[in-house]
C-alpha cells in the first residue's frame, strides 16, 4: 500500500530460501574414558561422561529399581551444585541421561551423588475409582558418591 496518494504498490515474487555453510568442530565434545576407573556401586554405575564448553551429559545406569527411585546431584570441584537442564530415560527405565551445564574449563573433577529419598506414608486418599498414598520425604540416603576426574 502507499503512504502518500501518489505512491504505488510493488509486489516482488521469489523465494527467501538461502543456504549458510556451517562446519561443526567435533573436537569440542570430550568423552571421558571411564573404562580404567570403577565408577560404580552395587546400585549405580556411571556409564559415560561427555563434556563440551556448553553442556555435560552424564549417563547413569541403575542396577536396582529404576530412575524415579533416585535423585542425582552433580557438584563441581568447588562443591557448587551444577544445574541440571533435563533428563531422558531409556524404555526399561534403568538408564538415565542427565543433561547439565558444563563444569568450568579449569575443573579437574566432578562429584556425582545419587540419593534415594527415605519416605514415610503420610495419608491414604480413597476416591471412588482408585486409592492414592501420599508420602513425606523424611530423609535421604546416599547410595553412590564418587569424585570423577574429567581431565
Question: What is each of the regions a protein language model found here?
Answer:
Residues 1-151:
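Alpha-helical, hydrophobic structural elements that either
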Amino acid at each position: 500500500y502507499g503512504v502518500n496518494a501518489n505512491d504505488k504498490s510493488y509486489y516482488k515474487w521469489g523465494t527467501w530460501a538461502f543456504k549458510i555453510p556451517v562446519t561443526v568442530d567435533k573436537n569440542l565434545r570430550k568423552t571421558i574414558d571411564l573404562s580404567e576407573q570403577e565408577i560404580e556401586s552395587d546400585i549405580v554405575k556411571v556409564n559415560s561422561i561427555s563434556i563440551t564448553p556448553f553442556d555435560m551429559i552424564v549417563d547413569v545406569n541403575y542396577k536396582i529399581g529404576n530412575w524415579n527411585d533416585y535423585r542425582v546431584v552433580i557438584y563441581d570441584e568447588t562443591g557448587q551444585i551444577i544445574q541440571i537442564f533435563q533428563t531422558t530415560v531409556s524404555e526399561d527405565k534403568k538408564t538415565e541421561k542427565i543433561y547439565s551445564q558444563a563444569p568450568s574449563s579449569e575443573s579437574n573433577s566432578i562429584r556425582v551423588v545419587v540419593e534415594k529419598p527415605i519416605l514415610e506414608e503420610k495419608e491414604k486418599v480413597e476416591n471412588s475409582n482408585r486409592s492414592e498414598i501420599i508420602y513425606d520425604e523424611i530423609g535421604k540416603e546416599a547410595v553412590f558418591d564418587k569424585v570423577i576426574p574429567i581431565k
